[in-house]
Amino acid sequence: MAESNKMKKMPVNKLMVQMGIPMILSMALQAVYNIVDSAFVGNMRTGSEAALNALTLVFPVQMLMVAVGIGTGVGTNALLARTLGQGNGKKAAKVAGNSLFLGVIIYAVCLLFGIFGVRAYISSQTIDTEVISMGIDYLRICCVISFGIIFFSLFEKLLQATGRSLYSTIGQIVGAVVNIILDPIMIYGIGPVPEMGVKGAAYATVIGQVASAILLFVFHMKLNREIEHDVKYMKPDSGIIKEIYAIGFPAIIAQALMSIMVYVMNLILKFSPSAQTAYGLFYKVQQFVLFLAFGLRDAITPIIAFAYGMRSKKRIQDGIRYGLLYTIVLMIPGIAITEFFPGAFATLFNAGQSREYFIEAMRIISISFLFAGINVAYQGIYQALDGGIESLVISLLRQLIIILPLAGIFSVFVRNGQMGVSLIWWAFPITEVISCLAGYVFLKRIRKNKIDVLN
């Protein structure tokens, strides 16, 4: 009741800050995993350049595993919360049980890919035998022990569905801390632990994920008393699975587009391993900045959706205004830091031969952060106002329809020696500006059809 009253009465600007800060911190924490691995790997005594390239090539598969796990979790979260609200305890238990059954299936697919598909995947992006070997080692470990990230994603959403999101954040923090502690120990070899190089980075990552998953499993079993826990509820129910993916599939697609974009960009940049590495390193820095916008978006959506349910035109308009304003405020420091201190990031990653490309990419692509952040906010606004199609179109424009053909065309001029690699980096700001203009048109249409008609 207090939560509902807060959503009704608290000034929107204060409410957005109060709801947004924990979500922003949570999203930023997710980005830490990728940056930490690359920073430690980049400072290996030997083979650091090849290892950084390998991490760049495996990243799309890591994102895809997260996409499927989170998308399944999102569908479970929404369906479970609705079912509990209806007081249907038996169905709630089936929803939770079926989500765990789906987790087992997802893990089985990842396991099979880890055993049989990794070599072909890595080899499609490079011919460097050292990079191929390191990429196979890293990705095989991440896939074979992927049950950690998969079940963490599911238990996180099961806890959020019952209002216990604090415990999922605790699990994230524990996993990040475990990863950060183990990275130098397992990569470089400290004490009785032998030097494992890129394999050590993979083991540190999956151990952190497993630690998070185990902790959230304990929280789920101990705290989610609204849900009956029994293996019998894991028996697959086609109706429930359809309901889960009716909600979760768009989230999987949105996340998977990021994975596809990075993979295709790696193919476009295949002519230059150093450019590939530079792009991969920059993408991880970019994720950290844009995840701030994603975190705020997760506050924008429920605030505007609640106001839309109340038919409160003023609170909807305030939600849009402050959502866009706060997003811009978050993006400005990100642009400033990446524009003025690219050398510091290059040193952190020990970028080596890719240093020049990395600094160039950072200075050019970071121009797009402002427009990218606004696009993310637009998507949160659309989703709150039943504009799922508009949100999907923006994702397609940003990560598929504009960026990949444009980068591909620019790469022809680069490979022919007519222009430098920097031309390819300009595809990103151009894409975000065009997408932002399209997003503004969508917002005007939604405002006219959904908001202005309210009394």
Identify the residue ranges that each predicted region occupies.
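Transmembrane helical elements of multi-pass membrane transporters/channels
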Residues: 18-37, 141, 175, 208-212, ...
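Small-residue hotspots at the loop-to-helix junctions and early N-terminal turns
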Residues: 49-60, 135, 139, 273-288, ...
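Short runs within selected transmembrane alpha-helices of multi-pass transporters and secretion channels
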Residues: 73, 142-160, 168-176, 201-216, ...
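Helix-terminus/linker motif at the lipid-water interface of multi-pass membrane proteins
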Residues: 28, 32-53, 122-129, 185-196, ...
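Short alpha-helical transmembrane segments in multi-pass integral membrane proteins
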Residues: 1-20, 80-147, 193-248, 304-368, ...
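Small-residue-rich hydrophobic transmembrane alpha-helices
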Residues: 52-112, 149-168, 278-340, 372-386, ...
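Transmembrane alpha-helix boundary and packing residues in multipass membrane permease domains
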Residues: 23, 27, 39, 78, ...
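N-terminal transmembrane alpha-helices
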Residues: 7-47, 60-75, 79, 104-111, ...
